[in-house]
Amino acid sequence: MSDTKTDVSNPEVLVREKLDELISFRKDNDSKTDFWAKQFDLGLAWVHFPEGSGGLNVNPKFQLLVNDTLRKEGISTNNRIANLLGIGMGAPTIVEYGTKDQIDKYLKPMFTAEEIWCQLFSEPGSGSDLASLSTKAIDDGDGYIVNGQKVWTTLGHLSKWGLLVTRTDPDVPKHRGLTFFIVDMESEGVEVRPLRQITGEAEFNEVYFTDVKIPKENVLGEVGDGWRVSLAILMNERVAIGGNVRQRGSGAPGHLVQLWKDRNLDDPVIKDKLVELWIQQEAVRLTNMRASEL
């Protein structure tokens, strides 16, 4: 990584120049993975992140420019869907609490969706009261030995890495005895059991940890400060899910309007409901745009 700092005196010009380079790269390379890797290297993965971490250290509102440009070019952003828990929740938390080695190791393959991530929070006996969790991590000198169970783990069966919160000190108040880890889901002792839904699919999973060894360099944040890291991840989850700014008239309202046109419908009741739905989505879109500039 170069030590040369990018000139951000005119961030919009900078972002547009990077976008031009990215779109030009696509003309000679149709690999999605290579494209997303190039997007990361250009700082267009999360523009507000520091340089070298997939960002340009500019206002997050310019991510809207990036996303809108890619949509108009017909370029896939499915990596954000396939790896929502990593890209939306894990990445900003690792940038805030992680070491440089962790940032360098995890963020790029996370963004390219080569390594899927999951969140390991809920347990059979602790859902809404997260701090009452019982999964234990015991320091054995050169690492931690983890035993316990998690449940409702989205994409756990597809994940390479997990964001895991455990109890490392049972003798202090419950919110102070937690530590956060990045766990390799392919480690010996990790067992993932899919939970079949009525549809036959298995998006959620039970995950069992039996004497799983996690190296100390995989602690995220400070030992005993897992509650703070957990709150950061939950905040990032809300931003990732609720803050996705769509194009005007996209998504379900756009599809319904097109269906209305294709079938030449003329029902005033349905028309009113369509207009109401469109207005609601537009209000959310504009609110998210405003929030991105704060």
Predicted stretch roles:
Residues G143, N147-R193:
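A short core secondary-structure module
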Residues G43, V66-G74, V165-T166, I182-E188, ...:
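Short Ser/Thr-interspersed hydrophobic loop/turn segments at strand-loop and sheet-helix junctions
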Residues M1-L84, V95, D101-K105, P109-T112, ...:
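Amphipathic, small/basic residue-rich leader segments at the start of a protein or domain
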Residues T135-I138:
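A structural signal for short hydrophobic beta-strand segments in well-ordered beta-sheet cores
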Residues A113-F121, V165:
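A short, Trp-centered hydrophobic/proline-enriched beta-strand micro-motif
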Residues T6, V190-R290, L294:
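Glycine-rich beta->alpha junctions and the first turn(s) of the following alpha-helix
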Residues P124-L133:
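Active-site-adjacent elements of ketosynthase-type condensing enzymes
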Residues I87, V151-G156, I198-T199:
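Glycine-rich phosphate/pyrophosphate-binding beta-alpha loops
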